[in-house]
UniProtKB/Swiss-Prot annotation:
Keyword annotations of the record: Acetylation, Cytoplasm, Nucleus, Phosphoprotein, Repeat
SUPFAM superfamilies named in the record: ARM repeat
SMART domains: ARM
Subunit structure: Identified in the CTLH complex that contains GID4, RANBP9 and/or RANBP10, MKLN1, MAEA, RMND5A (or alternatively its paralog RMND5B), GID8, ARMC8, WDR26 and YPEL5. Within this complex, MAEA, RMND5A (or alternatively its paralog RMND5B), GID8, WDR26, and RANBP9 and/or RANBP10 form the catalytic core, while GID4, MKLN1, ARMC8 and YPEL5 have ancillary roles.
Main localization of the protein described in the UniProt heading: nucleus
Cellular localisation: Nucleus; Cytoplasm
PANTHER family in the record: ARMADILLO REPEAT-CONTAINING PROTEIN 8 (PTHR15651:SF7)
Name of this chain's protein: Armadillo repeat-containing protein 8
PROSITE patterns for this protein: ARM_REPEAT
GO biological process, one term: proteasome-mediated ubiquitin-dependent protein catabolic process
Gene3D superfamilies xref list: Leucine-rich Repeat Variant
Pfam hit, one: Arm
Amino acid sequence: MACLLETPIRMSVLSEVTASSRHYVDRLFDPDPQKVLQGVIDMKNAVIGNNKQKANLIVLGAVPRLLYLLQQETSSTELKTECAVVLGSLAMGTENNVKSLLDCHIIPALLQGLLSPDLKFIEACLRCLRTIFTSPVTPEELLYTDATVIPHLMALLSRSRYTQEYICQIFSHCCKGPDHQTILFNHGAVQNIAHLLTSLSYKVRMQALKCFSVLAFENPQVSMTLVNVLVDGELLPQIFVKMLQRDKPIEMQLTSAKCLTYMCRAGAIRTDDNCIVLKTLPCLVRMCSKERLLEERVEGAETLAYLIEPDVELQRIASITDHLIAMLADYFKYPSSVSAITDIKRLDHDLKHAHELRQAAFKLYASLGANDEDIRKKIIETENMMDRIVTGLSESSVKVRLAAVRCLHSLSRSVQQLRTSFQDHAVWKPLMKVLQNAPDEILVVASSMLCNLLLEFSPSKEPILESGAVELLCGLTQSENPALRVNGIWALMNMAFQAEQKIKADILRSLSTEQLFRLLSDSDLNVLMKTLGLLRNLLSTRPHIDKIMSTHGKQIMQAVTLILEGEHNIEVKEQTLCILANIADGTTAKDLIMTNDDILQKIKYYMGHSHVKLQLAAMFCISNLIWNEEEGSQERQDKLRDMGIVDILHKLSQSPDSNLCDKAKMALQQYLA
């Protein structure tokens, strides 16, 4: 049975294969079972903490032989158990070791071992499985390939504290996404794991807690179930609250806070519940203090960011808890030159992971500033904050760049900040640089923020236009990613609002009529709505309306007709009728409507529609067409009277809707004048 390494065996590795390593493997083939057992035990002692020895034994083919012995019916239970222990030890080496074990199909062999009646052997197999499944190179799907595995693991939970610890650890590492959550939930994970929270073993309690955090994440079904689970007469949320008290280990506090956070975000616990406001939120803020380890501060800040993200009241409470906004500023000064860390290993680790702190701080600032103007002001006034965010936009880590862009996007929702801090720091410059070349996930947020910077009151609008934004945004509208198409067209819509004719002409030229009409037939509703919004903004002010309609009138009227005939919702049709109303406001452009009987019939149809919004939009078209003070109004009024429009106006003047009634009466006044 061959067992191949994914990476080629280098000569240097082979030269290091010692005679003693070969001797260990040779003993596995001894005809005397006792000698084989002793050989495996000696191998176990030789590989503990010795990665070089582990690599040597794998290269020499120890794994296939150990797996063969583990699966042989003639092997004693003691031998099988020792084989599982050695395999587990080999798995605790490098990621390459784990890959080699996976190549030899170790997982099916170990899962088969779980069917044994012997508890010690089962525990050894589970320990090895735990080590393999917690490795980043192991695909989680391998746990779910055989449908009998999960129910069997559930049954083994009652065997011992070790089976409980290892199985919960396997579940928490292999539960990635809703499909896995559903499988575990349907096989009774909640009921089977809940009572483990009161286990005498800390490790079991901890692994059970981790299980619940991954099961509840973004899962309303699991979260709603957890709220009502009783363990020894106590509800699960109450148990979680006890586990996040200050006297509990930090790991337990953090994981309990995550469970309650995920249940809250999934809608199972109210955001104003005391267990969130008075327990979970303060616990997570505590985790952000500089007394905590780097990974605790990262996890605390990221979990808190997730908890408060949709709720303005929680954002306000968090912002005034333990000086959180100032506390987060320390995330950017770590480790300091006079660091109190005396452990060199810890210092080396933290230097390598300091970017995770910056990422977490940006995420939490983004959540804190999502809604409240005062909080945004406090964040921006925190020492050098805008400089730090701008620096974050050019960091090498994609995750930090994404978090920095999200933070800026959150702060850019403030009219005041767009006019002041964003202008003072010329934020648009690094943002435009980010938009030139970034992964889609960053582009989506950066382009969304650009939409805010292009609002008409933003001082950044002019310099952004001068730096080639039109071409960049028109390029985004051709993206395969619908979110990028939406943002590209949205930003162009903002750019066109009350813009000069030159800017509007630039947009139309860069976008091209072909692309504009492709967007008008886009399957994504948001893209269609924003494209209609762009068209509406382009067709505003009479000279602009007449100019654009003189060059693009035929295509625009064609697009309007198609949308009004299509299966679109009320909002789409309302926006389209508003575009027609704008065209009807042009001096020469209105002729394109008056000479198009098909369009006139559609306007008439929508005047009698059951939905008031559409009736009002159609009324705007009619009002603009019949306005007395404009040249040719008499001919237009006569034509519309012949179509029966005046009769409809009389009916609408009796409408119970006051707005519609007033508009109809005003239109009738034009006929009487």
